[in-house]
């Protein structure tokens, strides 16, 4: 046996050493067989004949480039550019190999003869004739077909075509247009009609398709994948005039935006394309098709100077997990956000292999430099070559650093390299003809740097030009042949700046890679250019501040800023100096006395002295007494005025004996500005204004304000009011209403122009992004930077080429694009207010209308909904002599339709049935006997009076409903006084019988109206409510909605329209109309101020139907409550047509008041089931929710999201490693079942859902707000409310006087880590302030409601800056916050930051339960993402007033205007604007500032007892009986907040109950929140459990005092009526929290 084993081992050794012949033969046989199989496979490749004559080198090049084909080089044709011509056949066949056989295919600009010869009967070629060469090419195609046909005819009869060609030629014979057409691909009308996805190929034709048309054109043809081949040279991206394609002997030549492609051996083949279009195609990744589909470019391969790529259609709605088919897509078009280019160096190297391991250097031609005429270009040079030269010559001393030595060294290393004493060929392939220019350029770079260091080290004080001269002399000594022209040559390099009093050397970056250059060239946002003018901007800001200060302090002075600056420039005088001189004249500090002005007040004297024209003045017009009360006096003279004011009023308006209303909006009234320059029309011609006019326009002597004169008019010449200007209106009440309406139009136009100026002067770098209702159009690029919701606007504000803003009227071409003036326009801005000319045109007409009382007898017909007001108008009106006016076009059209149908003739026309705007703007000569106004209470009272005066009528009938929606003032910084909102009528008629409303709705009407309401409708029950689980269910395919669709908000309306519903309107738009069936839809779950029992919007919504109304809602609210109430009413009661709902009374029981703060220990009793029972009472159903695997379900199911433009990395969709790691953790199972969820795993879906919830789909509720002026007013009110004036002034003086000391204060208290971050920071450049990282909190927030049962809670997001940014700004804002908190009136206001719960309890202990107060709580939903540029302007104004440095303020604002969110973990990138960032250093204190400013602007905090603020929480104690404004409307229209004001019996603040007793208060944490946390599913061990118990015990320590549990019961009942008593629950909670062993029993370890 041993012998056998030995023999076996010997044989193995022999085989291993090759001595065994049998094994060697077997191995040779194996190699032979593999070679045979390989050749057999190669023989199966498609066979191609390369007929052109090419060289042996080219033969190898073609064979290696296309291994997919078996190529036979027949060499039967000799032609020019034979290599390129032969390659076109291979390129087309390579792309057709990618197309599935038989799949319909479009060949864009293709050779249809080649497809015919290949037998492809499924290809359509688009062969447009773009020039004469294309015509000639089509002639050759026809000849080729003729030759082929003749070849098969022959002399002896017809030979049949090959079988595979028969179908293709039969198709060409029967339908040539199916094979080829002469249209460009974008306009091709041919359709395969198969219903299948098509393909497309483009062989060197993609250049001629505009970049923006590629995606839509492919999608219109239902193309799934498009394969394209094209030539390109990276030299074109460097700005080179020539780009060579050496392999095929071709080149690109650049001529402006045209690039010419031609062959060096033959000049007739010459094609011209758009260079800009080629760059866009090369640089971009996404080609949008519509609002859903996008084509993604994927690079395939580069072969013989030809790039191949494919465009793959992607469905952005479906992600990559599922497949769906939609028959049609939305019509609105949007472009995806373009990502930064070439971030991946590997991808970059594949695209442009010649740029691999190379850097860009500036190249100077030595011959031009010697002549003084410098031309700078760029060149790609091997990086090692450049670094070797620079590293070597940098060691030369000054004597050795001459150009000859550098040239000699460069030549030596280029020509040879010595290795071990042997000279070999150089490894660097640098063109020899350019060595001179390369060496000179590198020499110049190093020489400039060394001489710069020398000049600084010498410390010689020389003029700036002397320094440059000195450097030129140094360079002359280093380069022979340089003469005096070297100085001019250095200046032309652009490296030196001698404009100021110093020499600045700006050297280019010598080590810039090709990808870095592309990023800077094509994606940079020009921050360097903006920073270069910072000093100019700062001086300009100072000038405008000084001008503004003079205007505010001294009325009557107007500045033409442009003329003022030109004047200062001409005299070479600092504008600030003249500003101080003017101020000194005003204040009489300059010692200058003007003759003849001694009797005038200082203000007026100074103004008259500075005026260049004559003025009319009245003596003794100085007013010194303050006017502090509102005075209403009818039919009295000006006796209440001072004599000066009375004379002035008489001069201005005559001795008017009518009624007069005087009101003020400010602290005191100063001298009104009564003087004006000649040739200036002042609008409004309304009240006596105490400051400068609101709206004025320079005019000629005989000109007036016309619409035609406004086109291209300077906005700066329309002097807009800055703040709410105090105005005194004179005349009768109707005259005052008319004057107020002109002011309203002026303020509306002023706010619109102000906001449009902000937009048009801002820097926007994106393309077709969305921001509220604004639109911004770049006239140079002919594209929208900000895409408006609707296009076709009537007018806009344009930034002209002279850097002025002007009003323009827009026109459009046939395609709907605006017709622009590229020469004079840079960009223009539009918004929702620029859709029509109504405001401008109304100002034009009404300015010329005399303001007198119309003297019309007005009868108000006040009727309930459906009482037949419109029918009564149609029945009573005399269509020959009377006029009907309506607020909207829909109502006017309805009246015309019904009247013509009733009389069976066109009695109602556009002349006697008109809207208010149309009637005022387009006056006609008709006079009317009577005017009938439908829904007349919806318009401004001044507009109604103007319309009645223009009509010339003697009597008017105003039909309306005082309980329905009134006129809404949408200009938030304009005051529409209460007394002017009242319509003055002579008679009132009432209608209380409704013919529309069913009986159940009539029962509701009786709770609204004081008189009994009856109905004639036979319908008994008509309303019902349906709760939907979420807004995503509201789609036509999922929820069928019958009847007219009505919404409460514009956002819900737009959401339903996007979902696919038609005929949707808001309640405001359909007031006064009637429908058989209606569907009222609420898709917004957050509180809406319009939805309340006494809201007029709810009344309108419930009374539009005659038969049925269904309310679809995502939450239960006041409407569902009303519907539930009317459904309970018995039918027998409804037959009475009138009913009243009894008032529900709550039995009150006096609390037991303890006269001292006692301590009563809790009795620690009970079992954990007590806590479970209490939780289920408060939040029924939450404990039955099985949500452990909701995250898994979401990943496995199809998801459809409504996204704003963003970039998604789909490879991060399934976070497999994190899932595996999470499953390996042993989570304890809680005994208590609450709404707490398991920790989520970050990934694309989770983070995307969180980002949609927290950052996207922002509310758009705000009206027209003058942001700049409104923010100034709010900030002033903020400081006057919370800070005493003397404290604020002391602080500002301290900040400005000792900024270094301020820096030392916060630096001394910083931790070592923060100081270390500052020490390691690279101060050469600024960090990216506008770039934020995004992450999520893994643990979902447990909410104290039942939403967990119907929705998948989104995680909380953290949007944060890098540490280096926080290290700079964190200490600064911390210092400013500390200073602010030290100034707050701590006796009345409490900012819950850096405080303890004990501090909160001590703050409220001043109030007892006996105090006469009411508790208000402002609840705001979507708080962070509702904040816009308005909120940011307020916050920045607060910081600046606290002393924030101007530079830091500018940087901070730049980092918050247009910000980039990047989530590297999930692979998401998107843009947001101004929105609150949840993780930057001002998140908490900034939110606190905003909520405090919001409350202070809406409530009289000067009368409050206490107020506390924390983040988005607020609690205010005010005296009872105060009247408040419409908080919901103000929060919506001004602050863009979905907010609601609650009156509470007990305060609830930051998760704590504020319980007041007889002698103070006690603060209890919310026990329900603590019990909810006991269901925590993220605990991983009992050590973790113990840490959790200690943290809860620290929070709940005040619950161990049971003395006031009876009051806590009442407080909990206020929020949770079904809670029952809470004492036993708190006893049980304290028992478990205080016992480690018992608390441990609340969690089970299933692994044991």
UniProtKB/Swiss-Prot annotation:
Catalytic reactions on record: RNA(n) + a ribonucleoside 5'-triphosphate = RNA(n+1) + diphosphate; ATP + H2O = ADP + phosphate + H(+)
Stretches assigned to the (+)RNA virus helicase ATP-binding domain: 831-991
Protein EC: 2.7.7.48, 3.6.4.13
Family: Belongs to the tobamovirus RNA-directed RNA polymerase family.
Record's subunit section: Heterodimer of a large and a small subunit.
Swiss-Prot/TrEMBL GO biological process terms: DNA-templated transcription; mRNA modification; RNA processing; symbiont-mediated suppression of host innate immune response; viral RNA genome replication
InterPro entries noted in UniProt: (+)RNA_virus_helicase_core_dom (IPR027351), Alphavirus-like_MT_dom (IPR002588), DNA/RNA_pol_sf (IPR043502), P-loop_NTPase (IPR027417), RNA-dep_RNA_pol_alsuvir (IPR001788), RNA-dir_pol_PSvirus (IPR007094)
Protein name as it appears in the record: Replicase large subunit
Annotated ATP binding sites: 863-870
Domain called (+)RNA virus helicase C-terminal: residue spans: 992-1144
Summary of the function given for this chain in its UniProt record: The replicase large subunit is an RNA-dependent RNA polymerase active in viral RNA replication. The replicase small subunit is a methyltransferase active in RNA capping and an RNA helicase. It also acts as a suppressor of RNA-mediated gene silencing, also known as post-transcriptional gene silencing (PTGS), a mechanism of plant viral defense that limits the accumulation of viral RNAs. May mediate silencing suppression through either inhibition of HEN1-mediated siRNA or siRNA demethylation.
Pfam families xref list: RdRP_2 (PF00978), Viral_helicase1 (PF01443), Vmethyltransf (PF01660)
UniProt keyword annotations, A-Z: ATP-binding, Helicase, Host-virus interaction, Hydrolase, Inhibition of host innate immune response by virus, Nucleotide-binding, Nucleotidyltransferase, RNA suppression of termination, RNA-directed RNA polymerase, Suppressor of RNA silencing, Transferase, Viral immunoevasion, Viral RNA replication
Domain RdRp catalytic: 1413-1526
Molecular function in Gene Ontology: ATP binding; ATP hydrolysis activity; mRNA methyltransferase activity; RNA binding; RNA helicase activity; RNA-directed RNA polymerase activity
Residues covered by the Alphavirus-like MT domain: 72-287
Extra facts: Readthrough of the terminator codon UAG occurs between codons for Lys-1144 and Gln-1146.
């Amino acid at each position: 046996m041993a012998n056998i084993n030995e023999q076996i081992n010997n044989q193995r050794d022999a085989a291993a050493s090759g001595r065994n012949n049998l094994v060697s033969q077997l191995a040779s046989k194996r190699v032979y067989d593999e070679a045979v199989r390989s050749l057999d496979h190669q023989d199966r490749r498609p066979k191609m004949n390369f007929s052109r004559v090419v060289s042996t080198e080219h033969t190898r090049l073609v064979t290696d480039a296309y291994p997919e084909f078996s190529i036979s080089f027949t060499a039967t044709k000799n032609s020019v550019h034979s290599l390129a011509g032969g390659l076109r056949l291979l390129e087309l066949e390579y792309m057709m190999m990618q197309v599935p056989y038989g799949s319909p295919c479009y060949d864009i600009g293709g050779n249809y003869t080649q497809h015919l010869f290949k037998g492809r009967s499924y290809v359509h070629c688009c062969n447009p004739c773009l020039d004469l060469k294309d015509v000639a090419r089509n002639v050759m195609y026809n000849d080729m077909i003729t030759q082929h046909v003749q070849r098969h005819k022959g002399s002896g009869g017809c030979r049949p075509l090959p079988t595979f060609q028969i179908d293709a030629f039969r198709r060409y014979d029967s339908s040539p247009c199916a094979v080829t057409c002469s249209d460009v691909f974008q306009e091709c009308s041919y359709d395969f009609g198969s219903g299948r996805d098509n393909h497309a190929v483009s062989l060197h034709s993609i250049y001629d398709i505009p970049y923006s048309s590629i995606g839509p054109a492919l999608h219109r043809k239902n193309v799934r994948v498009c394969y394209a081949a094209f030539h390109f040279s990276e030299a074109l991206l460097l700005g080179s005039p020539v780009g060579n394609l050496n392999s095929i002997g071709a080149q690109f030549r650049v001529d402006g935006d045209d690039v010419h492609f031609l062959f060096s051996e033959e000049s007739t083949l010459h094609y011209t394309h758009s260079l800009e279009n080629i760059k866009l195609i090369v640089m971009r990744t996404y080609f949008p098709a519509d609002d859903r589909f996008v084509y993604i470019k994927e690079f395939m391969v580069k072969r013989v100077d030809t790039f191949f790529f494919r465009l793959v259609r992607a469905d952005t709605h479906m992600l990559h997990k599922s497949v769906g088919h939609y028959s049609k897509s939305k019509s609105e078009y949007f472009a995806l956000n373009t990502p930064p280019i070439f971030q991946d160096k590997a991808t970059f190297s594949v695209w442009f292999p010649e740029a691999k391991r190379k850097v860009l250097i500036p190249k100077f031609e030595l011959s031009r430099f010697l002549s003084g005429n410098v031309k700078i270009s760029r060149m790609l040079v091997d990086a090692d070559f450049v670094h070797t030269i620079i590293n070597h010559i940098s060691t030369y001393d000054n004597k050795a650093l001459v150009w000859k030595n550098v040239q000699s060294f460069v030549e030596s290393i280029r020509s040879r390299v010595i290795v071990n004493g042997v000279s070999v060929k150089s490894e660097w392939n640098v063109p020899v003809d350019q060595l001179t220019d390369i060496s000179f350029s590198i020499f110049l770079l190093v020489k400039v740097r060394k001489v710069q260091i020398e000049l600084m080290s010498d410390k010689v004080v020389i003029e700036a030009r002397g320094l440059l001269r000195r450097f030129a002399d140094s360079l002359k000594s280093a380069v022979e042949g340089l003469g005096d022209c070297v100085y001019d040559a250095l200046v032309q390099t652009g490296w030196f700046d001698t404009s100021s009093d110093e020499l600045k050397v700006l050297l280019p970056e010598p080590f810039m890679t090709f990808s870095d250059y592309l990023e800077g060239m094509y994606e940079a946002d020009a921050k360097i250019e903006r920073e270069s003018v910072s000093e100019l901007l700062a001086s300009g800001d100072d000038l405008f501040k000084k001008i503004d200060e003079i205007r505010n302090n001294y009325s009557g002075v107007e500045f033409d800023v442009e003329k003022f600056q030109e004047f200062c420039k001409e005299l070479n005088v600092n504008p600030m100096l003249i500003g101080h001189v003017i101020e000194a004249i005003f204040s009489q500090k300059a010692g200058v006395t003007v003759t003849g002005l001694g009797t005038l007040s200082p203000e007026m004297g100074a103004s008259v002295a500075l005026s260049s024209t004559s003025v009319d003045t009245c003596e003794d017009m100085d007013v010194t007494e303050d006017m502090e009360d509102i005075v209403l006096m009818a039919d009295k003279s000006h006796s209440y005025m001072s004599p000066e004011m009375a004379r002035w009023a008489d001069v201005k308006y005559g001795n008017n004996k009518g009624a007069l209303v005087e009101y003020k909006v400010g602290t005191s009234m100063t001298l009104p500005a009564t003087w004006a320059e000649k040739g200036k029309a002042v609008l409004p011609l309304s009240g006596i204004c105490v400051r400068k006019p609101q709206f004025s326009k320079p005019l000629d002597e005989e000109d007036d304000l016309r619409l035609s004169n406004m086109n291209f008019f300077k906005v700066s010449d329309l002097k807009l009011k800055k703040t709410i200007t105090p105005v005194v209106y004179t005349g009768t009440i109707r005259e005052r209403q008319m004057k107020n309406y002109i002011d309203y139009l002026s303020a509306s136009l002023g706010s619109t122009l102000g906001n449009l100026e902000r937009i048009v002067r801002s820097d926007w770098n994106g393309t077709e992004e969305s921001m509220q209702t604004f639109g911004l159009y770049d006239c140079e690029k002919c594209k929208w930077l900000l895409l408006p919701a609707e296009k076709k606007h009537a007018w806009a504000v344009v930034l002209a080429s002279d850097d002025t803003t002007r009003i323009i009227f827009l026109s459009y071409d046939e395609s709907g694009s605006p017709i622009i003036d590229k020469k004079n326009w840079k960009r223009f801005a539009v918004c929702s207010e620029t859709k029509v000319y109504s405001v401008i045109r109304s100002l034009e007409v009404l300015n010329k209308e005399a303001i007198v009382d119309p003297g019309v007898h007005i009868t108000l017909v006040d009727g309930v909904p459906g009482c037949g007001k419109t029918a009564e108008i149609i029945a009573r009106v005399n269509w020959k002599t009377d006029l009907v006016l309506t607020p909207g076009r829909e109502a006017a059209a309805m009246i015309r339709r019904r009247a013509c149908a009733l009389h069976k003739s066109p009695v109602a026309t556009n002349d006697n049935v008109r809207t208010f705007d149309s009637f005022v703007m387009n006056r006609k000569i008709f006079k009317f006997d009577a005017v009938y106004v439908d829904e007349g209470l919806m318009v401004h009272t001044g507009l109604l009076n103007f319309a009645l005066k223009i009509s010339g009528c003697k009597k008017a009938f105003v039909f309306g409903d005082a309980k329905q929606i009134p006129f809404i003032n949408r200009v938030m910084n304009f005051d529409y006084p209460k007394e002017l909102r009242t319509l003055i009528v002579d008679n009132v008629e009432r209608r209380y019988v409704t013919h529309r409303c069913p009986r159940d709705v009539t029962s509701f009407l009786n709770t609204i109206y004081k008189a009994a309401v009856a109905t004639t409708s036979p319908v008994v029950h008509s309303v019902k409510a349906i709760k939907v689980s979420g807004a995503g269910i509201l789609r036509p395919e999922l929820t069928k909605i019958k009847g007219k669709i009505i919404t409460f908000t514009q956002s819900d309306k737009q959401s339903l329209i996007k979902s696919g519903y038609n005929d949707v309107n808001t309640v405001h738009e359909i007031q006064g109309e009637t429908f058989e069936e209606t569907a009222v839809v609420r898709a917004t779950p957050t509180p809406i101020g319009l939805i309340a029992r006494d809201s007029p919007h709810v009344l309108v919504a419930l009374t539009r139907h005659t038969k049925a109304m269904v309310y679809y809602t995502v939450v239960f609210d006041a409407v569902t409550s009303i519907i539930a109430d009317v459904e309970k009413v018995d039918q027998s009661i409804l037959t009475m047509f009138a009913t009243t709902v009894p008032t529900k009374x709550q039995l009150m029981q006096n609390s037991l008041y303890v006269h001292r703060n006692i301590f009563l220990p809790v009795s620690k009793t009970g079992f954990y089931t007590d806590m479970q029972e209490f939780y289920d009472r408060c939040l029924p159903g939450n404990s039955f929710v099985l949500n452990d695997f909701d995250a898994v379900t979401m990943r496995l199911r199809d998801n459809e999201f409504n996204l704003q433009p963003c970039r998604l990395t789909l490879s991060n969709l399934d976070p497999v490693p994190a899932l595996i790691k999470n499953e390996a953790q042993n989570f304890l199972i809680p005994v208590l079942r609450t709404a707490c969820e398991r920790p989520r795993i970050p990934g694309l879906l989770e983070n995307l859902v969180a980002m949609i919830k927290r950052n996207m789909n922002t509310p758009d509720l705000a009206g027209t707000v003058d942001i700049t002026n409104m923010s100034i007013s709010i900030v002033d009110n903020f400081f006057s409310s919370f800070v005493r004036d003397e404290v604020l002034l002391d602080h500002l003086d301290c900040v400005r006087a000792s900024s270094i000391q301020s820096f030392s204060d916060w630096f001394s208290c910083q931790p070592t880590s923060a100081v270390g971050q500052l020490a390691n920071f690279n101060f050469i450049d600024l960090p990216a302030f506008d770039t934020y990282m995004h992450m999520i909190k893994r643990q979902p927030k447990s909410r104290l409601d039942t939403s967990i049962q119907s929705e998948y809670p989104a995680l909380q997001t953290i949007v944060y800056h890098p540490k280096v940014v926080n290290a700079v700004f964190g200490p600064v804002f911390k210092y400013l916050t500390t200073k602010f908190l030290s100034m707050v009136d701590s006796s009345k206001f409490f900012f819950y930051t850096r405080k303890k719960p004990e501090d909160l309890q001590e703050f409220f202990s001043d109030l007892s339960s006996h105090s006469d107060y009411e508790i208000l709580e402002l609840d705001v939903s979507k708080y962070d993402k509702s904040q816009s540029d308005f909120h940011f302007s307020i916050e920045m104004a607060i910081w600046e007033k606290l002393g924030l440095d101007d530079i830091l303020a500018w940087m901070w604002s730049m980092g918050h205007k247009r910000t980039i969110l990047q989530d590297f973990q999930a692979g998401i990138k998107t843009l947001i604007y101004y929105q609150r960032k949840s993780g930057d250093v001002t998140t908490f204190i900034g939110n606190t500032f905003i909520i405090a400013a919001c409350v202070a602007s809406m409530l009289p905090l000067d009368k409050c007892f206490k107020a506390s603020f924390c983040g988005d929480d607020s609690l205010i104690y005010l005296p009872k009986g105060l009247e408040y404004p419409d908080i919901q409307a103000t929060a919506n229209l001004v602050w863009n907040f979905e907010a609601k004001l609650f009156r509470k019996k007990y305060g609830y603040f930051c998760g704590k109950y504020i319980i007041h007793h007889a002698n103070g208060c006690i603060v209890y944490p919310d026990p329900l929140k603590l019990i909810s946390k006991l269901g925590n599913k993220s605990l991983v061990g009992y050590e973790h459990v113990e840490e959790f118990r200690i943290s809860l015990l620290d929070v709940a320590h005040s619950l161990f005092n049971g003395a006031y549990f009876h009051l806590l019961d009442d407080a909990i009942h206020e929020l949770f009526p079904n809670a029952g008593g809470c004492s036993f629950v708190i006893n049980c909670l304290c028992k478990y929290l205080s016992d480690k062993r018992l608390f441990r029993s609340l969690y089970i370890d299933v692994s044991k």
